[in-house]
């Protein structure tokens, strides 16, 4: 178990548990976590504190019901090519139900790039999206909030509903925010010598995330959850002769 922890800890304890069970580990997940704490293998976690809010997250029931989107900086320390002042950004979309992610690297934090990101998002996710949720950044909405941005216009063209989080309330987009913490760990270990290397590495990181077991998914991967849902829908369609959902 110790060896599996060292190898897979970056993917989370759920993946450590799945890999350990493959070698015959018989203890429960909670028992494994306790053992890791006793071995001082897991660093203490400093919890963030937020102001009180009456907001409550609701549990989605199918892929595409709500997709969270956000954008983060690619650390300048990871970029060893091009002009020293050149910045890059990662646009992230995560489906709340399956936790499947789609990533894109752009060279500007702009509404043009986020709008373009939407054009292929449903194809890359593999299903129709009902709602997209973002914060109130200028890369998504106009500062005045009176005129629709390119991002909002593109959502309407795609027949996708749009929700914005309350200002200064990052926890309302918590799933994409938490996934960005994993990305920060990823970038902290990377030094890109070329743009092509960066794109290839980020694509590999996204694939690894979508194929890594998560405790919140009952030790399944995002792709496994999506596959199982599609199979249930196909079975229901054959039984009830009606469409419940649209997949690509």
Question: How would you describe each model-predicted region?
Answer:
Residues 1-75, 149-153, 226-233:
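Basic, flexible linker segments flanking DNA-binding modules
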Residues 14, 30, 112, 195-199, ...:
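Residues in well-ordered alpha-helical elements
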Residues 30, 46, 132, 165, ...:
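Residue-level detector of family-conserved "landmark" positions at structurally sensitive sites
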Residues 68-90, 98-200, 204-208:
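RNase H-like DDE/DDD metal-dependent nuclease/strand-transfer catalytic core used by mobile genetic elements
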Residues 158-160, 181-248:
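C-terminal domain-tail junction helix/linker
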């Amino acid at each position: 178990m110790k060896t599996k922890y060292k190898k897979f800890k970056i993917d989370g304890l759920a993946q450590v548990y799945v890999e350990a069970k493959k070698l015959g580990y018989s203890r429960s997940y909670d028992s494994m976590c306790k053992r890791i704490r006793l071995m001082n293998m897991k660093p203490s976690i400093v919890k963030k504190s937020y102001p009180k809010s009456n907001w409550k997250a609701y549990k989605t029931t199918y892929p595409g019901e709500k997709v969270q989107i956000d954008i983060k900086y690619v650390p300048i320390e990871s970029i060893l090519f091009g002009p020293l002042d050149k910045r890059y950004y990662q646009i992230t979309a995560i489906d709340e139900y399956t936790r499947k992610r789609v990533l894109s690297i752009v060279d500007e934090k702009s509404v043009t790039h986020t709008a373009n990101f939407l054009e292929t998002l449903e194809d890359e996710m593999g299903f129709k999206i009902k709602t997209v949720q973002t914060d109130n950044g200028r890369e998504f909405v106009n500062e005045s909030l009176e005129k629709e941005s390119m991002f909002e216009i593109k959502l309407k063209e795609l027949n996708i509903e749009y929700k914005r989080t309350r200002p200064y309330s990052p926890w309302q987009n918590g799933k994409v925010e938490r996934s960005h913490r994993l990305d920060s760990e990823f970038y902290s270990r990377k030094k890109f010598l070329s743009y092509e290397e960066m794109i290839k590495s980020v694509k590999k990181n996204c694939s690894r995330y979508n194929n890594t077991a998560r405790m919140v998914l009952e030790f399944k991967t995002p792709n496994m959850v999506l596959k199982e849902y599609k199979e249930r829908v196909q079975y229901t369609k054959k039984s009830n002769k009606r469409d419940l959902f649209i997949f690509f």
